[in-house]
Amino acid sequence: MFDPTERGTAIDIEVNDRLRKTLALILAGGRGSRLMDLTDWHAKPAIPFAGKFRIVDFTLSNCINSGIRRIGVLTQYKAHSLLQHIQRGWGFLRGEFNEFIELLPAQQRTQGENWYKGTADAVFQNLDIIHAHRPEHVLVLAGDHVYKMHYGKMLAHHLAAGADVTVACIEVPLETAKGFGVMAVDEDDRVIRFDEKPDHPQPMPGHPDQALASMGIYIFNAQLLFDLLQKDSINPETSHDFGKDIIPSLVKSHRVIAHHFQDSCVMHEGAREHYWRDVGTIDAYWEANIDLTTVTPALNLYDESWPIWTDQPQSPPAKFVFDSEHRRGMAVDSLVAGGCIVSGAVVRRSMLFSNVRVNSFCVVEDAVILPNVDIGRHARLKRCIVDQGVVVPPGLVVGEDPVLDAKRFHRTEKGITLVTAEKLKLLGA
């Protein structure tokens, strides 16, 4: 396994120089259909997370904190809110120092007038722009995962190993590995096999219940990437995808190195795990948000050495009003964002995003309430997610009757109910 400290200061100087010559490309065009109605009008990377952020903020912050200041964000599906967020919150880079975040929506730039047909095709359709920046290395990233990672350490490994391509990887339970690219490596972490979403994932040697999975993070030597994408673009038998086509085709002919996430994961003192989450299902999204309300969550949002940057709306402080025995505004074991008012209501183990109004006599427990929600009096909301801008009618009860919840809303197998404006309209609310 790579030791990022073994070459000392020399590698730091070299890597810092190479980071300045690296171009990061964030793939942020996916819908994330498993999030159901949450992505009806927003791409998955634009979905709110952790009270005040968007999912894409974590990948962008990793770039900035790692010293990568040349970034392209590739968008496609319903990108308006994502583009707006980046324009408002990420305009602090200095163009005079060749720092930038370029927004690269699908524009049918190539012959055939096709939209992005796959992850590799998305990059190929922007090759002219990428060429113009003359990068030495291209870092390809997914914009829809939540994690903290120092990409400089991954680049150091790439350079030290003399790699053509480096693939970030993480150990996952074998039963969930079907949803990932699964790889096998030799004693030097050279990838000797790569299968994208296999029906029968190969377990790790000595760990029959674990598989080594791709994180969808790649470092390419730039010229090699250009050549590969040109060849892929004229291949009629390819799906134009990095995981399905590009990486498997390189394993035998090129030096493809696996970089273990634990070697570059940014962890806080006392952390119990290397935190990486695909919040691509309703259950996973709810669990990741609710975990942040615990005393010692797996993800530390308060680490000033690795800040998560975002758009900062001009909201007043959160407000809690009324203090009588039966009408007390309070929140316990919860995160409450700016602009919220908890008026004579009780909030427990919940996440309130910005500008949420919880009116008198309400009970909100184990709930994720997205921005600009108004919860009417006497409502009881438990184990649920309430979508952005929803007006919850007075007296609505969610989370107490599984059968009724399943009839009215989308309810997961784990018992999480998704409350949306569209479903409430069907109820006549």
Swiss-Prot record:
Domain of life: Bacteria
Listed GO MF terms: ATP binding; glucose-1-phosphate adenylyltransferase activity
Catalytic activity line of the entry: alpha-D-glucose 1-phosphate + ATP + H(+) = ADP-alpha-D-glucose + diphosphate
Alphabetized Pfam families for the sequence: Hexapep_GlmU, NTP_transferase
GO biological process: glycogen biosynthetic process
Cysteine disulfide partners in this protein: none
Keywords attached to this entry: ATP-binding, Carbohydrate metabolism, Glycogen biosynthesis, Glycogen metabolism, Nucleotide-binding, Nucleotidyltransferase, Transferase
Main EC class the enzyme belongs to: transferase
CDD domains given in the database record: ADP_Glucose_PP, LbH_G1P_AT_C
Pathway(s) of this molecule: Glycan biosynthesis; glycogen biosynthesis
Annotated EC: 2.7.7.27
Residues noted as binding alpha-D-glucose 1-phosphate in the record, renumbered to the chain: Y116, G181, E196, K197, S214
Subunit structure: Homotetramer.
Matches recorded under NCBIfam families: glgC (TIGR02091), PRK00725.1 (NF001947), PRK00844.1 (NF002023)
Family according to the record: Belongs to the bacterial/plant glucose-1-phosphate adenylyltransferase family.
Function comment: Involved in the biosynthesis of ADP-glucose, a building block required for the elongation reactions to produce glycogen. Catalyzes the reaction between ATP and alpha-D-glucose 1-phosphate (G1P) to produce pyrophosphate and ADP-Glc.
Name of the protein in its database record: Glucose-1-phosphate adenylyltransferase
Gene that this polypeptide is encoded by: glgC
